[in-house]
Amino acid sequence: MWLEESQMKSKGALHPRRIPWVCAVVSISFLSACFISTCVVTHYFLLWKRGSALKFSDYHTRLTCILEEPQPGATGGTWTCCPVSWRAFQSNCYFALNDNQTWHESERNCSGMSSHLVTINTEAEQDFVTQLLDEQFSYFLGLSYEKVEGQWQWVDKTPFNPNVVFWKVGEPKDSMEEDCVVLVYDQDKWVWNDFPCHFEMGRICKLPGATFDWNPSK
């Protein structure tokens, strides 16, 4: 049953014309809090913000958004949003797990979270990823040796660059059974080592983050 205007006033209800202003105040307060610190939002807030569907599946219903460091002189910046508990770096999201699985089980687990085993394409990315890891564990990468093609390949089909590698000294050994790659902590640094794919290791999953630009002057 709809309330008449007089009833709304007597009951302290909001006049319909005030509702947009209240929504605006709530939105401004929300965004101000986000600008001060990392912001946790829902998938649906970002659908409204961007006006389009995100890359995330319904598996990830809550996201953490961070504002990337703006360029000197810039008036705005870029928000990168990742599922809660994932870490953002250069528009991608990363999640490390220590429980042991085989390489194929690890990739299936990542796929179930709309991601893949991690690809590493730069030294900066290698440095970031290794900050997430526990030195007591080793972690599968999304890199494996395809005997038919006779070369290393990333699981997400990212081109493999032989000039951007971080092999342990003496690796890879090109053993018949060591067709998968793990990150291992050896002599005070994280390095790549080829391992049998049926060994059980931890894993690192990676997926593209959701990004949108923010400009306070607009």
Curated annotation (Swiss-Prot):
One of its GO terms (biological process) is T cell differentiation involved in immune response. It is found in: Cell membrane. Keywords: Adaptive immunity, Calcium, Cell membrane, Disulfide bond, Glycoprotein, Immunity, Innate immunity, Lectin, Membrane, Metal-binding, Receptor, Signal-anchor, Transmembrane, Transmembrane helix. Expressed in myeloid cells (dendritic cells, macrophages and neutrophils) and B-cells. Disulfide bonds join C82-C93, C110-C205, C180-C197. GO terms for molecular function: carbohydrate binding; D-mannose binding; immunoglobulin receptor binding; metal ion binding; pattern recognition receptor activity. Residues 48-218 are extracellular. Residues 89-206 form the C-type lectin domain. Residues 1-24 are cytoplasmic. It comes from the Eukaryota. InterPro entries: C-type_lectin-like, C-type_lectin-like/link_sf, C-type_lectin/snaclec_domain, CD209-like_CTLD, CTDL_fold. Ca(2+) binds at E171, N193, D194. SUPFAM superfamilies: C-type lectin-like. GO terms for cellular component: external side of plasma membrane; plasma membrane. Glycans are attached at N100, N109. The chain crosses the membrane at residues 25-47. Heterodimer with CLEC4E; disulfide-linked. CLEC4E acts as a bridge for interaction between CLEC4D and FCER1G to form a functional complex. Heterodimer with CLEC6A; this heterodimer forms a pattern recognition receptor (PRR) against fungal infection. Calcium-dependent lectin that acts as a pattern recognition receptor (PRR) of the innate immune system: recognizes damage-associated molecular patterns (DAMPs) of pathogen-associated molecular patterns (PAMPs) of bacteria and fungi. The PAMPs include alpha-mannans on C.albicans hypheas and mycobacterial trehalose 6,6'-dimycolate (TDM). Interacts with signaling adapter Fc receptor gamma chain/FCER1G, likely via CLEC4E, to form a functional complex in myeloid cells. This is C-type lectin domain family 4 member D. It comes from Rattus norvegicus. The gene is Clec4d.
